[in-house]
């Protein structure tokens, strides 16, 4: 998809939101669907437009944190679990500036798993993440990488976020799991966060040479309709390499097919948020 900005994205976002941070969570209780890769690459692409982006690692596996900060350096950093446990802890003491300009991360450690069990004992535990975000300012977007479960941490992301992106990978697609996820989202919207919406469904790790993958993609598009983004993310080793090296694929291999796919997906997301408007398709961008 070719995109024509209404003005520079950073200026338009701030004008539309009056300085309010846009909070988006990548959610799916299935593992291996590309949540971390999606969060990382959207963060990089949005940061390159001049927007100030904060990544939140809410997955106790801490893959996003380990890849962006480094496994050796991560133990020396404070993480989001400290903010869950103590009102006296300050977000600015935990947020890490990354080499990519305008990109930051609030990391976590493996201990977040035990912390999530402790916060369940608190009657206000559902709103813990939202309360943390209320102490954070100065960012245009907050992007949340959630764990592969529908537990208390994912529920916290439902309550703290305004928009959800559901990444779906054909290799691990389960309609039953999708229905469970949608029921959980709807229950949260009805009872705890009326502003919550599904911004879109992203088809991840697709290989159109495999007929089964194409069939599942069509099933996803039939089931979700216009919620599915036109842009898809291909299955490629470049994406895995980028995550491992802690950079966006657009930095690692800017001329690659998958880098273009992430640029297109980012543009679609901004378009759905009303930040940019679509123009005519560019040659070669048509969905095959």
Label each residue range with its predicted role.
Residues 1-288:
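P-loop NTP-binding core
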């Amino acid at each position: 998809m070719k995109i024509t900005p209404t003005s520079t994205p950073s200026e338009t976002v701030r004008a539309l939101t009056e300085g309010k941070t846009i909070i988006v969570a990548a959610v799916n209780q299935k593992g291996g669907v590309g949540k971390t890769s999606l969060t990382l690459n959207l963060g990089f692409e949005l940061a390159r437009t001049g927007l100030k982006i904060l990544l939140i690692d809410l997955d106790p596996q801490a893959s996003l944190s380990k890849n962006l900060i480094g496994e050796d350096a991560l133990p020396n950093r404070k993480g989001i679990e400290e903010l869950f446990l103590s009102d006296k802890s300050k977000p600015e003491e935990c947020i890490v500036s990354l080499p990519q300009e305008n990109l930051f991360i609030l990391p976590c450690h493996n201990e977040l798993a035990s912390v999530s069990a402790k916060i369940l004992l608190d009657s206000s535990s559902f709103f813990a993440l939202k309360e943390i975000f209320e102490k954070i300012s100065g960012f245009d977007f907050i992007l949340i990488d959630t764990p592969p479960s529908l537990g208390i941490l994912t529920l916290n992301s439902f309550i703290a976020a305004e928009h959800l992106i559901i990444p779906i990978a054909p290799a691990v697609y389960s309609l039953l799991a999708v229905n469970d996820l949608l029921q959980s989202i709807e229950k949260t919207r009805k009872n705890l966060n009326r502003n919550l919406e599904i911004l879109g469904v992203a088809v991840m790790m697709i290989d159109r040479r495999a007929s089964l993958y194409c069939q599942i993609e069509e099933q996803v598009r039939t089931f979700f309709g216009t919620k599915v983004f036109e842009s898809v993310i291909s299955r490629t080793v470049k994406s895995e390499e980028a995550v491992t090296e802690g950079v966006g694929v657009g930095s690692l291999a800017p001329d690659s097919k998958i880098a273009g796919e992430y640029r297109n997906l980012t543009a679609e997301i901004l378009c759905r948020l009303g930040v940019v408007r679509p123009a005519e398709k560019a040659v070669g961008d048509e969905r095959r």
